[in-house]
A protein has these predicted regions:
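AMP-binding/adenylate-forming catalytic core of the ANL superfamily
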Residues: 3-4, 8, 18-19, 29-30, ...
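Hydrophobic residues in beta-strands and at strand termini
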Residues: 12, 109, 139-140
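Glycine-/small-residue-rich beta->alpha transition segments that form the dinucleotide
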Residues: 15
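Short, solvent-exposed helix-helix connector turns and helix-capping sites enriched
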Residues: 22-23, 152
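A short helix/loop element that forms part of the nucleotide-sugar donor recognition site in Leloir-type
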Residues: 24-28
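AMP-binding/adenylate-forming catalytic domain of the ANL superfamily
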Residues: 128-150
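A short, polar/charged loop-to-alpha-helix boundary motif
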Residues: 160-163
């Protein structure tokens, strides 16, 4: 329903694949039938706004559960990218005894720039709630991405856990 505060799943109808070969459970989760209509649910979380448009929140696989709250990695990445020194960033969860997972950002800075963590977090804090801010910022010389430009969350998580 437009304007509802709830978060839902992006889904589509039409020409839908039959499913995953040999994986009935995954097929049922990704391609459910609801009231006789078959859907594809790729894992994107969304919110429908009052004007009927859809706000894409992020991939469910990149959602971080921290302190009982869900944090969409893409939302935090966009907030960090608002700082002019940040060229690229990837946000992941890192195991934490206190938080379950804590938000950690791997950031690539513009050559010659060296803002403090406090400066980066202050800018990001203007765009997202404080509980979503990274508990740690890790700097890298070059971000690892797939040939199509997708974030390599596995690499970023390894950086975060190894730090």
């Amino acid at each position: 329903e437009p304007g509802h505060d709830g978060i839902g799943w992006l889904a589509q109808t039409g020409r839908i694949p039959l499913g995953y070969l040999g994986d009935a459970e995954r097929s049922a989760a990704t391609f459910p039938s609801i009231d006789g209509v078959r859907y594809a649910v790729p894992g994107d979380r969304v919110r429908r706004l009052r004007d009927g448009s859809i706000e894409l929140l992020g991939r469910d696989a990149a959602t971080i559960n921290t302190g009982g709250e869900k944090v969409f990695a893409e939302e935090v990445e966009q907030a960090l990218l608002q700082h002019p020194a940040v060229v690229d960033c990837v946000v992941v969860g890192r195991p934490s005894l206190r938080w379950g997972d804590e938000v950690v950002a791997v950031v690539q800075l513009r050559s010659g720039d060296d803002p403090s963590d406090e400066e980066l977090l202050a800018e990001a804090g203007r765009h997202v709630a404080r509980f979503k801010l990274p508990k740690a910022l890790l700097r890298c010389e070059a971000m690892v991405r797939s040939p199509s430009g997708k974030a390599d969350y596995r690499w970023a998580r390894a950086q975060a856990v190894g730090a």
